[in-house]
Amino acid sequence: MAYLILVIFILSCLLAFFEDLLPKKYQYSLFFFFGICLILMCGLKEIGLDPDSDTYAQTYRSYYEEESSKEVEGSFILIATILNFFTDDPHAIFLFYALFGVSLKLFAFSRYDNKRLFLFLVFYLSYFYVVHDMMQIRTGILSALYLLAIHEIVEGRRWLAFLYIVIGSFFHVSGLVLLPILFFRNKPLSVVEKFIWTGVVIFSLVVSASGGTVFDYLIEIPYVGEKLTLYQQAADVGMANSTINGFGVFHLISIALFVYLIFFSDAITEEDHHYPILIKTYACGLVFYTVLGFIPDLAARVSFLYRTATIILLADIVFTIKPRWTAVAVTELIALFYLNYGLQFIHFPLLWKTAGAD
């Protein structure tokens, strides 16, 4: 499976160099073909390839048991109930989630910029394809709707963005943590705002290092508190990650890229009118990673849900470097760095072995 991902990744990298010169019919045909391949790869994957597929397969087969309803949303149980009328093969539900998760993301890419489709695909394949659409399949649909919601906010249709988030929460309740983006403005960042957002990211890292926690406050929220308790218990018994490294290479590089994007915010905003809200969601993702570090598994899931926006945002780096071929090459090297971490989840160390996204 990792080799198939690598093939599409390399082809997308090559096409990204001259996709602005490709006739639209060829560009969209190739993009559509890659999409079909990605859907089938997710849907027909070997059970056990990633950390979550065994659990999903078991839940699909035992959807009628009370314990299953405690582990997943009612939407998963409903879909499993319907699909079980036709087959008890878990690949049926993998295909269902892949069909909507992957196709909605590709549609979202076209809404942002149809001249950078393959560059978006490069960053999508580098991390979020494996983590969301192959592993955390419920989050796959949610994160796609999240990307669409951001676009609608930029276009002034916040009611539609709200609807996308609500629908996404139907597939994974963590979508509720995305509601604050509805209040984000999309105006170009002022100098003060740049310092504030950068300061918040750095401050969260300092608080994390000092042992700060917001667990005692969040635990009081109905339902959310129950979910937090389950995550905490899983960590205590070793079912989830027990530590999170806010000073690991992965996170520090992510912060460095955030600072770089802030520094070139004016130049990027001229080319991508989505930038102001995208950079704010990136900041939120970085903050959640450290502030929620007392429950590492939850911190990673919420953080990378917010950071799905980096598929678009990191591709904006091409607007900060001249000439274009150099810009594309640099962004693809960044994507290669993330790909090394993403493929770890399916047991394929590409460049060096890591513990995932430390």
Feature map (PLM): residue ranges:
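TM-lumen/periplasm interface segments of multi-pass membrane proteins
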Residues: 18-98, 341-358
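Transmembrane-helix signature of polytopic, membrane-embedded enzymes
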Residues: 25, 109-126
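Membrane-interfacial loop-to-transmembrane alpha-helix junctions, especially the N-terminal start
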Residues: 27-31, 269-282, 325-330
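Alpha-helical transmembrane segments and terminal signal-anchor/GPI-anchor hydrophobic tails
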Residues: 54-58, 63, 73, 77, ...
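Transmembrane-helix motifs of polytopic, lipid-linked glycan transferases
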Residues: 96-112
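Membrane-interface alpha helices of multi-pass inner-membrane proteins
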Residues: 129, 160-184
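Short acidic/glycine- and proline-prone juxtamembrane loop motifs at membrane-interface regions
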Residues: 134-140
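Membrane-interface transmembrane helices that cradle and orient dolichyl/undecaprenyl
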Residues: 146-160
